[in-house]
Each structure stands twice: as structure tokens, then as C-alpha cells.
Amino acid sequence: MDYLESLDFPKVVEIVKKYALSDLGRKHLDTLKPTVNPWDELELVEELLNYFARWGEPPIKGLNDISQEVERVKSGSALEPWELLRVSVFLEGCDILKKDFEKREYSRLKETFSRLSSFRDFVEEVNRCIEQDGEISDRASPRLREIRTEKKRLASEIKRKADDFVRTHSQILQEQMYVYRDGRYLFPVKASMRNAVRGIVHHLSSSGATVFLEPDEFVELNNRVRLLEEEERLEISRILRQLTNILLSRLNDLERNVELIARFDSLYARVKFAREFNGTVVKPSSRIRLVNARHPLIPKERVVPINLELPPNKRGFIITGPNMGGKTVTVKTVGLFTALMMSGFPLPCDEGTELKVFPKIMADIGEEQSIEQSLSTFSSHMKKIVEIVKNADSDSLVILDELGSGTDPVEGAALAVAIIEDLLEKGATIFVTTHLTPVKVFAMNHPLLLNASMEFDPETLSPTYRVLVGVPGGSHAFQIAEKLGLDKRIIENARSRLSREEMELEGLIRSLHEKISLLEEEKRKLQKEREEYMKLREKYEEDYKKLRRMKIEEFDKELRELNDYIRKVKKELDQAIHVAKTGSVDEMREAVKTIEKEKKDLEQKRIEEATEEEIKPGDHVKMEGGTSVGKVVEVKSGTALVDFGFLRLKVPVSKLKKAKKEEKEESSAVSYRPSSFRTEIDIRGMTVEEAEPVVKKFIDDLMMNGISKGYIIHGKGTGKLASGVWEILRKDKRVVSFRFGTPSEGGTGVTVVEVKV
């Protein structure tokens, strides 16, 4: 039985095929089926995803489907010029792709596509022999050049003679012209003047008034032209055969290249699918856990992500709830994602998703239409279930939709429980949907099973499509009836007809749903608080950036003034030295006076500074000419280490003065100093836009704390976030280098950045 079809596997493959470059990739995708060892395919997909994130699309020049051309080569046919051009472009593309992968750091891609064979000699020969429009070039062979040269010379001679003939025989011609038909030059002679010239009549006009005549003097020339044309055709055929034989002599290499490009195109399509659907590569694991799994056949704007986890000590889920509530989509997604992962496909879900390998995936998917189904429908489902039960074992994943429906509810429930028990005894992992109460009760009491339900909003009388784990689903019949206005007396009468056990179960389920609703409300409140916190954090970071820019501008001004003063003194010293070497005594005296004056000014400055209060650790100070207030950390050898909050500077004591009280207070109101600092940040879940200010602040903090290396955790996923982070780092001049982490550092889920300190 083709269980994959019931899980929508072929439909998803059709979606992926739309992203392939050619039929080669599309055919390869059709060959992908679940296997117990999908590691090779998954690792290649993951590496190509990372390639896209870092380098963009790989070079894909001319990677078209040349299967028909290869078959013609195998059959012994000589390829036509346009076919040889297609093969040449394809093989040139193979060479470009191989060289590109050789210089990248992706070992699996490099190893796999290193087997592409180079056909450089063939490509060069085709480029030499065939023009881009498909015409055979004169360069193809010396003989072809000779033939064409002779043809041109002969054509020139014939044209000259034809022009002379028209001029000298104008009286017998219907028109002053000649035509070229079937490889011969003919003249339109008046029928009445037919015998005025010796020659062969080839055509007669429809009116009979004109004959198209080949004069005897042109017959030999035309024959020579026809002979040259035949020689040209034979020479071209020889050249095409020679080029085709190069391919025939390396047929195995050619076929291997086609197979490898088919595989590459298939990988390319899967990666494009992953990027379009925000997918990720899920490797085989020992558990089943879906994190925001999105069924690819449901439109993006309507799909509700599925979150589901089967603990290691459990072997199955019993999912209950009203029809059309999403039960079927949930269990199909588990089976579909398992089959896709085992076939080497990325999955539209978030990181953290885990799936097991099952050598057997079996499913019976029903139609969520009505509780009342025909006997024939029940029989067809039971036929599939019989086959599943017969083949199930500990290597099996079994998906059963609406088990027990289509017959008497009591018998159907008993049959469903018995089938579930048998599958569990055989060691199978099961995902079952039902609306039968006895099956819910059975699941609640079985140590290997978990109940789950599809959330239902009684206010809107509609499902939310969210999975509630640990809570069996109710029918909501009474709630719906009451909401729609049915008399309460009738509803109470209906309730009274339920057994005590049924009423207790209904009450328990209702109580659990109420608790879940309260928890969901708390979750929403926490989410709201988190959003408010993020807004405050963004505002704080923006304020911090403004403050830092302001401080840096102040220091830039002070440094410029200091540099100007140094340049002025240096210039005066240079002038003094020059005067000493070349000037007169008067000029030297003047230069000495200038230097003496500068010396006195500096000495006076030191005296004034010395009279001020001594600067010591703990003092609040300002730089000379500046407004930024900092705190002295230590004083050593006439130099103070001053903490300005956002950075620390070593400043000569002579360049500092104590701050006034009001300046201290202002400083304490705006100064910033991180209380603690970690050398890593986690930006998983953020968009590139959200991550940019966080990454830039992280670089600020690294530099302020004198740390040269940091770690940015962005996860693997589609690679969009990693690509965005690398673009941010590439533009930041403070960054010395960056790279993906080693396996021990987190691999491609982490970027290691080094900054200037």
C-alpha cells in the first residue's frame, strides 16, 4: 500500500519540484523516498543552506537537462551544433560549480561534487568550432576554411558575370535582375526570346510569359558551387562527428556528471523550499518533538503551527476533539514530517524539532466529514487497518485517523481500544484520532499513552486548531446547543440522560480546559510584559547610543585641540632648527625668544596646576576643555586612569581638573557602567532588524571591557539570521574578523567575532 500518498508526501514533493532548475532535479526529487539512513542527504542540504546564508546562490550557469543529448551520443548519432552547444555550456557549468565548492569550507559538498569530471578540452573545441548562433566557424578546420574561401571567390566571379549578362542582354530579359534558386543562378528571360540564348530552362512563370533560364556559360560555374556546398556539408558532418566522439570516448564521465548535477539540482530545490517556508534541517533523533511545525500544503496566512512532544516513556497519542478541528492535520503532519526527514527534505518548523527514524510508516487517513459514514467506507478503512496491524512491529510509526468511526459507537470504541492495545503490544509508536469517549478513557488510564485535544472556542463556536497536550477533547455539544439558543430545560434533560461516569468525565474535561484557558491567559500576560520589556530595552539602548555619541564627540574635540597644540609647537621647533642651520644671528635670537616664551607658558601652567588641590583616586574630574565627568580609579607616575562610564582612559594629571558638585550629580544621573558582562549573546528568534542593535551593542560592550573575542548565538535554521549578522559585522570597522564556530563552539549555529581592543 502507498501510505505516503495518504500523508500528502507526493504533493509536498511537487511543491519542492517548482524550485528545481531543470528536469534533472525534478526527476531526482521523484526518486527520494524514506530511508533509515538519510544522513548524507540531510548533511548536504544543511551545508547548502549555510552556503546560501553566507555566499548567496552558488554559480548555476547552464545546468540544464542534457539527458536526450546523452542518449543520442550512446546511440551513435552525431550531435547537431545546437546540441553540442547545450552540452558544452552544461559541462562548463559543472566545472565552475566544482571549482566554487573546492574553495569553500563545506566538506560534504566539496567531497560529493569533487567527482564532477572536467571536459575543458571538449568545451574549448566546441567554442573554437561552433559560433554562439549555432553556425560552424571557419576556424573548425583548415579544409572548411579553404572550401568557404573558394565559395566566396566563385560567388564573386559569378556575380560579376551575372551583372555583365544582365547589362548585355537587357533586351531579352523580363526584368533587369537574376535569381538564385536551388543552388543555381537563373535569369528571367522573355518566353518569346527563349531561343536567343543557349541554356537550360528550370522554371516557367505562372503566366507563361517568363522562363527562368540558366545560360550555358553559367552551368559549369553553378556546378562548381554545388560541388563546394556538398564538400562543405561533408566537412561539417565530419567535424560534428569528431566532437561527438570526444563525448562518446568519455561516456561514463559524462553520465556521472549528469547524475551529480541532477543531485545538485535536487538539493538546490530543497534549499530554496526551506528558505521560502522558513524551514530547517532536522536530523534523526531518539524522540518525537514538533516545534511550530507548519503543514506546507496549508497557506502561510492560515496555517496554525503545531507544537507536540511525545516523552521517551510514552509510545502514543490519542487526539480527540470535534470534527474539522485539526486532528487529522496534526497526525498527518507527524507522519509527513517523519517521511520527509527520512527522505532528505528540510522541514517547515523551528529549531528544537526532533524526529525518529521508522523503517515502517503506515497510515489510514479518514475524511473529516461526518460521524455517520457508510458501511463501504468503514469496510475500506478496516481493510487498510487489517494490513497495518498484520505488519506492525517495534519499527513502525502508525497513523490512524478517526479510528472506530463508521459503525455503531459502542462496537467501534471497543474495536478501537482492542486495535490500539494490539499495536502497543507489538511495540509500535501510534498517533490516533477519535471522538469516542471510551477511547479517551482508555488513553487516560494507559501508562504508554497520552491524551491530547484540539482547542475549541465556545464563544465563537469554532476550533482554534491548537493542540492541547494532556487534555482529552470534549464534543462541546451542550455548549454549542446552549450558545445557539436551545432551551436550557432541554439541555438539562439531555444531561440527565448521561451516565454518572459520563457526567464526571465531561466535568473533568471541562475543568481541565478551564485550567488550560487560565494558563493560556497567564502566558499571554507574560508575553505582553515581555514585549513591554523589549520596548523599554530598545529605548534604553537608543538613549545609551545617544549618550555615547555625545561623549565621543566631546573627546574628539579635546583630542583635536591637543593635536593642534602639538603641531604648532613642532612647527616652531622645526623653524628654529632651520634657522640654526641656515639663518642669521638675528633670526636665531628671534627663534630662541619664541621657544623661551613657550617654555615659560608651559612652566606657568604647571605652577598653576600644582597649586590646585591634588587629584587622587575617587575624585570626580573633567578633562581640560571638556564637559565629560569621570571618576579617578588610580593615579600612577603622573597619569590617572579615569572611568567615564562608557569607557576608561589614561590621562595625564596635568590635563585634569576636579569637577564641581553639580557636575558630579549630573554625571551620576547619566553615567552607565554594566554591572556584569557575558562574552556571548543569544539572538535566536529575532529578525535581522531586531538583532542589529543588539549585535552592535555587544561589540560596544566587548570593547569597553577590553575583551577581544565574543560569541553570537543565532542558530542554524534557514541561515537568514546568520547571513544578516555577517553583513552587520562586515560593515563594522571595529570588527577584526569573524567566522562560524568550531563543533565544540556550536558549529554553524554560532558566529565567533574578534574586535579591536
Swiss-Prot record:
<dbReference type="GO" id="GO:0016887">
    <property type="term" value="F:ATP hydrolysis activity"/>
</dbReference>
<comment type="function">
    <text>Acts as a ribosome collision sensor, splitting the ribosome into its 2 subunits. Detects stalled/collided 70S ribosomes which it binds and splits by an ATP-hydrolysis driven conformational change. Acts upstream of the ribosome quality control system (RQC), a ribosome-associated complex that mediates the extraction of incompletely synthesized nascent chains from stalled ribosomes and their subsequent degradation. Probably generates substrates for RQC.</text>
</comment>
<dbReference type="InterPro" id="IPR036063">
    <property type="entry name" value="Smr_dom_sf"/>
</dbReference>
<dbReference type="GO" id="GO:0005524">
    <property type="term" value="F:ATP binding"/>
</dbReference>
<keyword id="KW-0694">RNA-binding</keyword>
<dbReference type="GO" id="GO:0004519">
    <property type="term" value="F:endonuclease activity"/>
</dbReference>
<dbReference type="GO" id="GO:0030983">
    <property type="term" value="F:mismatched DNA binding"/>
</dbReference>
<dbReference type="InterPro" id="IPR045076">
    <property type="entry name" value="MutS"/>
</dbReference>
<keyword id="KW-0255">Endonuclease</keyword>
<comment type="function">
    <text>Endonuclease that is involved in the suppression of homologous recombination and thus may have a key role in the control of bacterial genetic diversity.</text>
</comment>
<dbReference type="GO" id="GO:0140664">
    <property type="term" value="F:ATP-dependent DNA damage sensor activity"/>
</dbReference>
<feature type="domain" description="Smr">
    <location>
        <begin position="681"/>
        <end position="756"/>
    </location>
</feature>
<dbReference type="InterPro" id="IPR002625">
    <property type="entry name" value="Smr_dom"/>
</dbReference>
<feature type="binding site">
    <location>
        <begin position="321"/>
        <end position="328"/>
    </location>
    <ligand>
        <name>ATP</name>
    </ligand>
</feature>
<keyword id="KW-0540">Nuclease</keyword>
<keyword id="KW-0238">DNA-binding</keyword>
<dbReference type="InterPro" id="IPR027417">
    <property type="entry name" value="P-loop_NTPase"/>
</dbReference>
<dbReference type="InterPro" id="IPR005747">
    <property type="entry name" value="MutS2"/>
</dbReference>
<protein>
    <recommendedName>
        <fullName>Endonuclease MutS2</fullName>
        <ecNumber>3.1.-.-</ecNumber>
        <ecNumber>3.6.4.-</ecNumber>
    </recommendedName>
</protein>
<dbReference type="GO" id="GO:0043023">
    <property type="term" value="F:ribosomal large subunit binding"/>
</dbReference>
<keyword id="KW-0378">Hydrolase</keyword>
<dbReference type="GO" id="GO:0019843">
    <property type="term" value="F:rRNA binding"/>
</dbReference>
<dbReference type="GO" id="GO:0006298">
    <property type="term" value="P:mismatch repair"/>
</dbReference>
<dbReference type="InterPro" id="IPR036187">
    <property type="entry name" value="DNA_mismatch_repair_MutS_sf"/>
</dbReference>
<keyword id="KW-0699">rRNA-binding</keyword>
<comment type="subunit">
    <text>Homodimer. Binds to stalled ribosomes, contacting rRNA.</text>
</comment>
<dbReference type="InterPro" id="IPR046893">
    <property type="entry name" value="MSSS"/>
</dbReference>
<dbReference type="GO" id="GO:0045910">
    <property type="term" value="P:negative regulation of DNA recombination"/>
</dbReference>
<keyword id="KW-0067">ATP-binding</keyword>
<dbReference type="InterPro" id="IPR007696">
    <property type="entry name" value="DNA_mismatch_repair_MutS_core"/>
</dbReference>
<dbReference type="Pfam" id="PF00488">
    <property type="entry name" value="MutS_V"/>
</dbReference>
<dbReference type="InterPro" id="IPR000432">
    <property type="entry name" value="DNA_mismatch_repair_MutS_C"/>
</dbReference>
<keyword id="KW-0547">Nucleotide-binding</keyword>
<dbReference type="Pfam" id="PF01713">
    <property type="entry name" value="Smr"/>
</dbReference>
<dbReference type="Pfam" id="PF20297">
    <property type="entry name" value="MSSS"/>
</dbReference>
<dbReference type="GO" id="GO:0072344">
    <property type="term" value="P:rescue of stalled ribosome"/>
</dbReference>
<comment type="similarity">
    <text>Belongs to the DNA mismatch repair MutS family. MutS2 subfamily.</text>
</comment>
